[in-house]
Design a protein with these regions (language model features):
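Conserved N-terminal catalytic/coupling substructures associated with nucleotide/phosphate chemistry
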Residues: 1-227
Length: 227
């Protein structure tokens, strides 16, 4: 609590720090109805997905690193995921130097990243493992893409829904956008260079950010719309 002068007036400023045992709720309303959050300057009730996320945060855990009890994982499964991750990294490398810098991925890396957990020497799949591999043990996380006629969502021109391993979803959504935006050309003397109306790097980054920063407790799909 402090005093601060603003526009010639002295006001009392109270700084309320976030608690470590979230979620906090109005006791008379209970946990399901009494949790409120601040969004863009407004106070609104938290939905059940947000409440679950706050419960994870309050216990110093995350949904991604929680054990996926419905899913078992073998050494062959682990090796297959490691190979797939390395192949994807090589495919996305833009130069020989980047390709040469790619390191082998193994069980220890998956453990340190929270993709696997371990108990009594036995590897356990986490929700992150299920999301990465597109396994049905967790609710499906999908990317829905659509092209619309005009500036509203009234009429579809084309639409696709992508599931499966998360990096495949990202690549498919990225290619969908490239297929459905304008492609022009720039000339430098005798040389022609194709130029998209939106930089491909920006498109890829937007889709990756949406996939990485979404809450996988929320079963809704990521939506990519082109007008």
């Amino acid at each position: 609590i402090m005093l601060q002068t603003i526009a010639g007036k002295t006001v009392i400023v109270v700084d309320v720090l976030p608690g470590g045992q979230r979620p906090y709720f109005i006791k008379s309303l209970g946990l399901n109805g009494g949790v409120y959050i601040r969004v863009a300057g407004t106070t609104r009730p938290a939905d059940r997905y947000m409440v679950r996320e706050l419960l994870f945060e309050g216990s110093n855990r995350s949904f991604d690193q929680a054990i996926c009890s419905e899913l078992t994982v073998s050494e062959d499964d682990i090796d297959a995921l490691c190979r797939a991750m390395q192949e994807e990294a090589r495919r996305n490398a833009r130069s020989d130097e980047q390709r040469a810098a790619i390191k082998n991925v193994g069980r220890e890396q998956l453990l340190s990243w929270g993709i696997l957990a371990e108990k009594d020497g036995v590897a356990l799949a986490t929700n992150a493992y299920a999301i990465l591999t597109g396994n049905a043990a967790v609710p499906p996380a999908m990317i829905q893409c659509g092209v619309f006629k005009g500036k509203t969502r009234a009429v579809f021109v084309d639409r696709r829904e992508y599931g499966g391993p998360i990096w495949e979803q990202i690549e498919q959504a990225y290619q969908f956008v490239l297929r459905n935006i304008h492609l022009g050309a720039e000339f430098d003397g005798l040389y022609r260079q194709d130029v998209y109306e939106i930089p491909p790097e920006a498109i890829r980054e937007l889709i990756i950010n949406a996939a990485v920063h979404r809450s996988y407790l929320d079963h809704g799909a990521i939506q990519v719309a082109i007008y």
